[in-house]
Amino acid sequence: MTELKLTEKAKSTALENGADLVGVLNVKNLPEHGERIERMLPGARSVLVIASRHSLASLRSGANELAQFDTIQAYNESAMAAHAVARYLEYQGFFSAGVPAFIPLDMDEPGKGMRGEICWRRAGVRAGLGSYGESGALVTKEYGQAVRLCGVVTTAGLSPDSPLEEDVCDHCMRCVEACPVNALTGGGKNNKKLCGDHIFKFGFRYFQKFIQGMMDEPTDEFRKIVQGNGLRQLWQTFMTGNYYYCFKCQSQCPATRLPVK
């Protein structure tokens, strides 16, 4: 099978199994992640970037649980697509593996679970899926910021896509203005501490605080956590695997629109 035919088949497999967009780039075009990719899959030559779209209604809903539910689904769909592509390529004789953008993550030092093996936003831009927005997120032509990403690393030599020549973001700054904690300042800059404390308010740091409260003498603050909303939210995080609590920058992007064909 030719390189082009193999690439087309890999992409169609992704699109048939939950992906809405697929791009390809050579491992050499991700030099920042070269060592990590080699650790994950020695001899990897290509990376496929997979995007699955959100429901726009869910992102903009006043009921946050709809956006959370849809986030779980979007990640599941991208994961299903990635695994389907990896299995297809292995049937063709190429070592291949799906790589998450969300969880599971490497919890060891120095990252401590705060970053994935590959920056899929960066990979998405270089694979021609979109361009950077003022928030630093990937903005696609088709779905704006309303996508979730993951991908595949493979020893197959696939035909790479080219980065877009156009800038998809119109730099309206609505994502920056929508941020409730002023973590976004434009130009792709993101105060990750401010953003993380808000969007992951019931994530690991909250759990760590909860455990510390159990080890220490009970305080009024800890009692409020146990008796109030905090423990219920923490339980839900464990049950669903989702700990996103803010979708403002995604939902306000004017490029995020209904995918009417």
Q: Each PLM stretch: what is its role?
A:
Residues M1-H83:
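Non-catalytic, usually N-terminal nucleic-acid engagement modules in DNA/RNA processing proteins
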Residues Q73-K261:
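Catalytic cores of enzyme domains
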